[in-house]
Regions:
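Acidic, polar ligand-binding/catalytic clefts
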Residues: 6-75, 131-155
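Short, charged, surface-exposed secondary-structure boundary motifs
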Residues: 43-47, 92-93, 116-118, 137-139, ...
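Bilobed "Venus flytrap"/periplasmic-binding protein-like clamshell domains
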Residues: 1-5, 9, 38, 58-114
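Extended ligand-binding regions for polar small-molecule ligands
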Residues: 1-4, 66-70, 74, 79-80, ...
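Terminal targeting/leader modules
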Residues: 33-36, 41, 53, 110-113, ...
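Sec-exported extracytoplasmic/periplasmic mature domains
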Residues: 2-6, 26-30, 67, 81, ...
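Stable alpha-helical elements in mature extracytoplasmic
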Residues: 1, 17-21, 29, 33, ...
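Hydrophobic residues within well-ordered alpha-helices
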Residues: 25-26, 76, 115-122, 161, ...
Length: 210
C-alpha cells in the first residue's frame, strides 16, 4: 500500500483458509495472497500462481502432550494424528509415517475447524503443521508447558507473497517491494531512520535512495 499509493492505510484484509485462499486470488477478491502458502511446482507451473520472493523458510513439525513421555514423532506408533486435509501438510505427514513404517490413525480436520482445537479437545494425540505455527499456537494454550514440539522437521516450506499469473506490472511491484525491504534491512534502513540516509556518502546507498 505504501509503495503503490503512498498510504500505509490504503489496504483491506480478507480472512482466507486453505481452500478459499486460491479461489479468492483467482476471482479477484484479493490482489495478493500473504497467508502461509508453500511455493510448490504444481501451484506455480500447473495451477498458474506466481510465487514471488520467499520471505520465510519454515518447516513442518509436530506437537504432542508432554505426559505421553515421547521425544520423537517416530515413537508415536498407533497414535491419532490430526491435520488439515488441504494443502501440503497432509501429504508431508502421510509421507513421513509411510517412510518410517509407522502405523497411525489419521484424523482429517475440515476447513471449518482447526487442528489445534481438535487436539486440545483430546480427539488426537498429536497434530502437525509449520513449526512457526506450532510455536505460536503453543503460547496461546492454557498450559503451554504441558505440550512439547518434537524435533523432527519433515519438510521445507518456502513462504512468500503470491499473485495471479498474467499481470506483470503487479507482480513486478510486489516482487521489488519485497526486494527493497530485504536490501533496506541489510543496510540498516527502516521507517524511523530512513531520512538520515538521504545524503549518505556511500554510492550504493545513494542509488538505493534514488
Amino acid at each position: 500500500a505504501a509503495a503503490v499509493f503512498g498510504d500505509v492505510e490504503a489496504i483491506e484484509y480478507e480472512i482466507v483458509d486453505g481452500v478459499s485462499r486460491f479461489t479468492h486470488l483467482i476471482d479477484g477478491t484479493i490482489d495478493m495472497l500473504s497467508a502461509a502458502t508453500t511455493y510448490t511446482f504444481t501451484r506455480n507451473v500447473l495451477k498458474k500462481f506466481e510465487f514471488l520472493p520467499t520471505t520465510y523458510y519454515d518447516g513442518q513439525g509436530f506437537i504432542t502432550k508432554r505426559t505421553l513421555g515421547v521425544s520423537s514423532a517416530k515413537q508415536m506408533h498407533g497414535a491419532k494424528i490430526c491435520f488439515s486435509g488441504s494443502g501440503t501438510a497432509a501429504k508431508n505427514i502421510k509421507d513421513f509415517f509411510e517412510l518410517h513404517e509407522i502405523k497411525y490413525i489419521p484424523i482429517v480436520v475440515g476447513v471449518d475447524e482447526k487442528s489445534k482445537d481438535v487436539y486440545l479437545r483430546g480427539e488426537c494425540d498429536m497434530y502437525g503443521t509449520d513449526r512457526s505455527g506450532l510455536a505460536s499456537n503453543r503460547l496461546g494454550f492454557n498450559n503451554p508447558e504441558l505440550h512439547i514440539i518434537l524435533p523432527e522437521i519433515i519438510s521445507k516450506e518456502p513462504l512468500g507473497p503470491v499473485v495471479k499469473y498474467g499481470d506483470q506490472k503487479w507482480s513486478d511491484i510486489v516482487r521489488w517491494t519485497v526486494y527493497v525491504l530485504f536490501i533496506g534491512e541489510e543496510m540498516g534502513i527502516n521507517s524511523k531512520n530512513i531520512d538520515t540516509f538521504k545524503n549518505h556518502k556511500d554510492p550504493y546507498i545513494q542509488r538505493f535512495m534514488g
